[in-house]
């Protein structure tokens, strides 16, 4: 079931309700900032605190307009270019476009990705349940 974000504007009369439905599909690019023990990468030595500081620094740099692809190349603990096409819950993935179902992604990654507008940047913070691989700095590109 797709989620909708609704805002009620209360005036004298009538009451207006504006709903923004999540898109059926998105394409995002992301930077994964992991720490030792979250992914099988032997040369990863940073601890959780170091990863959090680095992720927040990169997030701010991206929000301030640094080239996102350059940041991905320099910092991601995932593969470059780190681009994922996703279909929302209830929408069949288009296999011909290498699209993933949102349900296959970690929850925080999917939640942030589908809330962003095109060219917006968001941060999915590490959580052992919803973002178990580390911090994801996400830019929606389509």
Positions of predicted regions on the chain:
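Acidic/histidine-rich, surface-exposed loop or edge segments in extracytoplasmic proteins
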Residues: 29-41
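C-terminal motif of bacterial Sec signal peptides marking the signal peptidase cleavage site
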Residues: 15-18
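Peptidyl-prolyl cis-trans isomerase
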Residues: 45-142
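Positively charged n-region of N-terminal signal peptides that target proteins for export
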Residues: 1-4
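Repetitive helical segments and hydrophobic/amphipathic motifs
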Residues: 11-12
């Amino acid at each position: 079931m797709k989620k909708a974000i609704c805002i009620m504007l209360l005036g004298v009369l009538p009451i207006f309700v504006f709903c923004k439905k999540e898109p059926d599909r998105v394409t995002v690019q992301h930077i994964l900032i992991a720490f030792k023990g979250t992914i099988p990468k032997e040369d990863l030595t940073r601890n959780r605190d170091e990863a959090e500081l680095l992720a927040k620094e990169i997030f701010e740099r991206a929000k301030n307009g640094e080239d996102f692809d350059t940041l991905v190349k320099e910092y991601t603990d995932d593969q470059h270019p780190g681009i994922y096409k996703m279909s929302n819950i209830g929408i069949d993935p288009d296999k011909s476009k290498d699209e993933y179902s949102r349900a296959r992604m970690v929850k925080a990654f999917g939640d942030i990705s589908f809330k962003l507008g095109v060219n917006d940047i968001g941060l999915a913070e590490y959580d052992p349940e919803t973002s178990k691989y580390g911090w994801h700095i996400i830019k929606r590109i389509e």
